[in-house]
Amino acid sequence: MEVHNVDLTISAVSDEQYPKTNIPEIALVGRSNVGKSSLTNVLINRRNFAHTSSQPGKTQTLNFYDVEDKVYFVDVPGYGYAKVSKKERERFGKMIEQYLTQREQLRGVIQLVDARHEPTPDDVNMYNWLQYYNIPTLIVGTKIDKVKRSAWNRQLSLIKKTLDVESSTPIILFSATEKKGKDDVWQWIEERMGKN
């Protein structure tokens, strides 16, 4: 998709603030600092539009990015980071769960995992949870440029095995610096945009 117009519509802290539109939404989930902002920036052809934070766990809102009035990218707070208070974590956990299970406009979830390492227990729990609720999921292995090309297949197998990936779940290896995987991610998003 050609992208020229992108707006951060709202950084929502409650469901009353979610955009009241019928535009399809794609949520991005993953551990703190896994590269959600970098993926968003590459997909929308901007360098620093989605803010990349050096402080993990900083995003504590659902950020709705309106892309060409055709799709919203929804940046979900990173999981698996302990610097936020337990009470705050529980509040956001509940909000995220409600968004992912009840939001009619949601067409699918992109789950990002760090391709350099074995997926964490938090990654496994998130994937299992998404599958339990039958939410269409794309796994994106980030930072693949930091892995030797000869080891890509090994890392791909590790992700598949650790997450116990279902055959219906595609996996794409992605590099923000080389823009590898960008077109494949967009293809999946566009396929989801047309589905109710």
Curated annotation (Swiss-Prot):
EngB-type G domain span: 22-195
Pfam families hit by this protein: MMR_HSR1
GO cellular component terms attached to this protein's record: cytosol
UniProt-annotated binding residues for GTP: 30-37, 57-61, 75-78, 142-145, 174-176
Cofactors (names): Mg(2+)
Entry keyword annotation includes ATP-binding: no
Gene Ontology terms describing biological process: division septum assembly
Superkingdom of the source species: Bacteria
CDD domains (UniProt xref): YihA_EngB
Keywords assigned: Cell cycle, Cell division, GTP-binding, Magnesium, Metal-binding, Nucleotide-binding, Septation
GO terms of molecular function: GTP binding; metal ion binding
SUPFAM superfamilies tied to this protein: P-loop containing nucleoside triphosphate hydrolases
Chain positions recorded as Mg(2+) binding sites: S37, T59
NCBIfam families, A to Z: GTPase_YsxC (TIGR03598), small_GTP (TIGR00231)
Family the entry assigns: Belongs to the TRAFAC class TrmE-Era-EngA-EngB-Septin-like GTPase superfamily. EngB GTPase family.
Main function: Necessary for normal cell division and for the maintenance of normal septation.
Name of this protein: Probable GTP-binding protein EngB
Protein species of origin: Limosilactobacillus reuteri (strain DSM 20016) (Lactobacillus reuteri)
